[in-house]
């Protein structure tokens, strides 16, 4: 280093020329050496990303999802302006749960449901995120496990079975029209 050679005591331009980290320095890495995620059996095929956890980790926190002026990025965030309702917030919450940085069983919890519930599954995140993070698909994966543990609300049961039971509505439509 030229500065170290000519200015060993850092008297010339103190704090103006700094010693950068080496590019392979572990401090620059996003995840610590002991970082690992829980591997869960998923309903969707996540092999394009490696696995479900790897797909979540595609979020690199670049903040493009905070865009309020152009595009359609995350309508729920545009309304609430809260980080938990942001694509990045949801992805990070999922990542923290699957890497056991949140309390045990956080992945399938009421708190995680609150984080995911305002996602309207419009897939704007997948289209507009530079990394293609698909929170709508991740929400579906989460809901599969959530509803195995907690029962579905009646409105959710009706909507999820609508294609199967549409004939009932057709028969009763004269009563409502």
PLM regions with names:
Residues 14-16, 58-96, 124-143:
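Iron-sulfur cluster-binding cysteine motifs and their immediate structural context
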Residues 4-12, 66-68, 84, 100-107, ...:
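Secondary-structure transition/capping motifs at alpha-helix termini
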Residues 1-54:
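Polar, glycine-rich mid-to-C-terminal structural blocks
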Residues 103-177:
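Iron-sulfur-cluster electron-transfer modules
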Residues 2-4, 48-51, 56, 62-67, ...:
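A general structural signal for short secondary-structure junctions and capping/turn motifs
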Residues 1, 88-91, 113:
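Long, C-terminal-biased catalytic regions of enzyme "large/alpha" subunits
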């Amino acid at each position: 280093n030229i500065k170290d050679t000519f200015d060993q005591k850092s008297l010339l331009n103190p704090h103006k020329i700094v010693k950068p980290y080496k590019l392979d320095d572990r401090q620059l890495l996003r995840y610590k050496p002991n970082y690992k995620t829980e591997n869960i059996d998923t309903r969707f095929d996540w092999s394009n990303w490696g696995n479900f956890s790897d797909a979540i980790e595609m979020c690199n926190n670049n903040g493009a999802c905070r865009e309020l002026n152009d595009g359609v990025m995350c309508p729920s965030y545009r309304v609430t302006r809260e980080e938990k309702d942001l694509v990045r917030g949801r992805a990070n919450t999922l990542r923290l749960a699957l890497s056991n940085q949140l309390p045990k069983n956080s992945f399938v919890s009421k708190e995680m449901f609150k984080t995911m519930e305002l996602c309207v599954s419009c897939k704007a995140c997948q289209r507009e995120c530079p990394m293609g993070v698909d929170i709508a698909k991740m929400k579906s994966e989460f809901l599969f496990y959530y509803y195995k543990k907690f029962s579905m609300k009646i409105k959710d049961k009706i909507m999820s079975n609508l294609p199967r039971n549409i004939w009932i509505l057709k028969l009763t439509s004269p009563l409502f029209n």
